[in-house]
């Protein structure tokens, strides 16, 4: 159950990271509220997952999900570059996340 909660926390991290972009420095109300709620929920769920998972593993997986998810949405939604090096690097991060799950 802790792993499912951790994945949800990571997905919420993606929402708040993208929300930061759409909030324009917290100058737009609705994206700012969504961002702050997602931040709080993400950190709360991360802390809850850490009750059962090693802190280093949980934090690395959480940030990895956030980094990969945010980069993918940056490419898809925001028109950020999708170079081969970037895609391969995201694949390496994803492989690391999977490796941490398998090792714990």
From Swiss-Prot:
Pfam families: Multi_Drug_Res. Guanidinium ion exporter. Couples guanidinium export to the proton motive force, exchanging one guanidinium ion for two protons. Its main location: membrane. Keywords: Cell inner membrane, Cell membrane, Ion transport, Membrane, Transmembrane, Transmembrane helix, Transport. This is Guanidinium exporter. It comes from the Bacteria. One of its GO terms (molecular function) is transmembrane transporter activity. Residues 20-28, 78-81 are periplasmic. Residues 1, 49-54, 101-104 are cytoplasmic. One of its GO terms (cellular component) is plasma membrane. It comes from Yersinia pestis. Belongs to the drug/metabolite transporter (DMT) superfamily. Small multidrug resistance (SMR) (TC 2.A.7.1) family. Gdx/SugE subfamily. PANTHER family: GUANIDINIUM EXPORTER, SMR FAMILY PROTON-DEPENDENT DRUG EFFLUX TRANSPORTER SUGE. InterPro entries: Small_drug/metabolite_transptr (IPR000390), Small_multidrug_res (IPR045324). It is a multi-pass membrane protein. One of its GO terms (biological process) is monoatomic ion transport. It is found in: Cell inner membrane. The keyword Membrane applies. The chain crosses the membrane at residues 2-19, 29-48, 55-77, 82-100.
């Amino acid at each position: 159950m802790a792993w499912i909660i951790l994945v949800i926390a990571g997905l919420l991290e993606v929402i708040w990271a993208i929300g930061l972009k759409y909030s324009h420095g917290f100058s737009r109300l609705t994206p700012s509220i969504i961002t702050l709620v997602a931040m709080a929920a993400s950190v709360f769920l991360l802390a809850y997952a850490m009750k059962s998972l090693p802190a280093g593993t949980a934090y690395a997986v959480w940030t990895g999900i956030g980094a990969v998810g945010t980069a993918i949405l940056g490419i898809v939604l925001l028109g950020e570059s999708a170079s081969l090096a970037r895609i391969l690097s995201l694949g390496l991060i994803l492989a690391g996340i999977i490796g941490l799950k398998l090792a714990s």
